[in-house]
Amino acid sequence: MNDPIGDMLTRIRNSQMRGKSTVMTPASKLRAWVLDVLQSEGYIRGYESATDERGHPALEISLKYYEGEPVIRELKRVSKPGRRVYMGVNDIPSVRQGLGVSIVSTPKGVMSDANARAANVGGEVLCTVF
């Protein structure tokens, strides 16, 4: 797998289109940190460590719906393995005039765009969520 974060975002997007309540994805620290941001911003119910059918470590993500519709309307990968996107604190874009969230990997950890601005740090923009 060349893009683990992109794979996880695609699994979430596909599962929500099918109306699934949970989705499994292979475990990694970076994926867990991204899920922490999604949970703190209210886009997923939560996640927990699990094992897949072959015994490999995995993360089971509990998806969130509001009145039968997915809470996440748009989930886009920004920085990709073939084209990394780094931005300074003043260049981090607001998503949909502040209604959405950019997830940024900074030297101080993975955080939302608002937290990155508050901490005055830039970094790699992993994805945007609306």
From Swiss-Prot:
UniProt entry keywords in alphabetical sequence: Ribonucleoprotein, Ribosomal protein, RNA-binding, rRNA-binding
A single GO molecular function term of this UniProt record: rRNA binding
Stored Gene3D superfamilies: 3.30.1370.30, 3.30.1490.10
Transmembrane segments: none
Origin: domain of life: Bacteria
Pfam families xrefs: Ribosomal_S8
Gene Ontology terms: biological process: translation
Any one GO CC term of the record: ribosome
Entry-linked PROSITE patterns: RIBOSOMAL_S8
Cross-referenced InterPro entries: Ribosomal_uS8, Ribosomal_uS8_CS, Ribosomal_uS8_sf
Function: One of the primary rRNA binding proteins, it binds directly to 16S rRNA central domain where it helps coordinate assembly of the platform of the 30S subunit.
Family, per entry: Belongs to the universal ribosomal protein uS8 family.
NCBIfam families documented for this protein: PRK00136.1
Name of this protein: Small ribosomal subunit protein uS8
Provenance organism: Ruegeria sp. (strain TM1040)
